A protein has these predicted regions:
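A cross-family acyltransferase "interaction/gating" segment
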Residues: 114, 123-135, 163, 167-269
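A recognition module on extended beta-rich or small alphabeta surfaces enriched in W/G with H and D/E
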Residues: 250-295
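Membrane-anchoring hydrophobic helices of lipid-metabolizing enzymes
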Residues: 1-88, 102
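Glycine-rich phosphate-binding loop signature in dinucleotide/nucleotide-binding domains
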Residues: 83-85, 161-165
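A Trp-anchored, charged/polar loop motif used as the substrate-binding/catalytic surface
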Residues: 147-160
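Short His-Asn-centered micro-motif
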Residues: 79, 91-94, 118-121, 172-174, ...
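Basic, amphipathic N-terminal segments that precede the first structured/catalytic domain
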Residues: 5-13, 135-147, 294
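Catalytic core of membrane glycerolipid acyltransferases/transacylases, capturing the structured
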Residues: 37-48, 52-59, 69, 87-149
Length: 295
């Protein structure tokens, strides 16, 4: 049926066919992940973090292979050495439905174990609901009445992360998938309380302003921890299923993922940190915008 749709609508790149193939590929990943998770439960290994991280890595690797085979994506990772040894907080750009998958694949390929701050709604995914809750992640309840409890739970993720621990904590500090309308609303909201900050962020063209609460919770709980900035291009416009359809119709193209590490001694404390984060975010925005223009 998908092939018929593509032929009737004269879609040369077969977007419907590609989406259906990837849906089947994803179904295989979900089924396999749940079977292995069930086997670990039966064997009394529900608390075996190493086994579950291995499962996560295999799951992510299978799905990224599916993106190559079914969607025609090519993937290049730059600066992967920044992940070596772990012991850091990863601040990642957020623009598509595949961002957490992309980062999980890249990080586990380096032999590092990622802990995630994700929205609770993602627990609708069966594998995340089972495996994600067995690992030290935090699924954020964005409607929680007590934001302090949520921030405390986020901070707990870095409290035992030591240098060379082989562990990183990943957060998407924009708080939602970026697009131009959200960017305008975010800057306007900041302007209500901090005109100075809004003025320096008005030049953003690809990223959203950082929502600092979660990032501060992670950094405050582990003073001196290194910070890794993760930027990627190639998934822009794929923030909705309709967006994925449009991208597939025109071609996914190359996906580039880059990591840059900043040692903890260079990360400001207190009130100076937000201006520093904003400046680094503006630098990332400029690089992302440059890459997008070249694609």
């Amino acid at each position: 049926m998908a092939v018929v749709v593509d032929i009737v609508t004269l879609k040369r790149r077969l977007p419907a066919t590609r989406l259906v193939l990837f849906a089947w590929w994803w179904t295989i990943a979900e089924t396999g992940g749940l079977v292995v998770a069930g086997w670990l439960f039966v064997r009394g290994r529900s608390n075996d973090a190493t086994a579950h991280y291995r499962l996560m890595g295999n799951w992510a690797n299978w799905l990224m292979r599916g993106m190559r085979v079914c969607l025609g994506a090519t993937i290049e990772v730059m600066g992967a050495e920044a992940l070596e040894g772990g012991g850091s907080v990863v601040l990642s750009r957020h623009v598509s439905l595949a961002d957490s998958l992309l980062s999980a694949w890249a990080i586990t390929q380096c032999g590092v174990e990622p802990r995630y701050v994700l929205k609770r709604e993602l627990l609708a995914d069966p594998c995340l609901d089972v495996v994600g809750l067995r690992l030290p992640n935090h699924f954020l309840d964005r409607s929680a009445a007590d934001g302090g409890e949520e921030l405390a739970a986020i901070g707990a993720l870095t409290r035992d992360v030591e240098p060379e621990s082989g562990t990183v904590v990943v957060i998407f500090p924009e708080g939602t998938r970026a697009n131009s309308a959200k960017r305008q609303r975010a800057v306007a909201k900041i302007r209500e309380t901090s005109p100075e900050r809004a003025a320096r962020l008005e030049s953003l063209t690809a990223l959203l302003p950082i929502r600092p609460a979660g990032t501060n919770a992670l950094l405050d709980a582990a003073p001196g921890i290194d910070v890794i900035f993760a930027r990627h291009t190639g998934l822009d416009g794929m923030d909705t299923f309709s967006g994925m359809w449009r991208r597939l119709a025109s071609g996914v193209g190359p996906i580039e993922l880059s990591f840059t590490r900043v040692v903890g001694s260079e990360v400001p404390m207190g009130d100076d940190r937000l201006a520093w984060l904003d400046q680094r975010w503006l630098e990332m925005d400029a690089e992302v915008s440059k890459r997008l223009q070249q694609q």
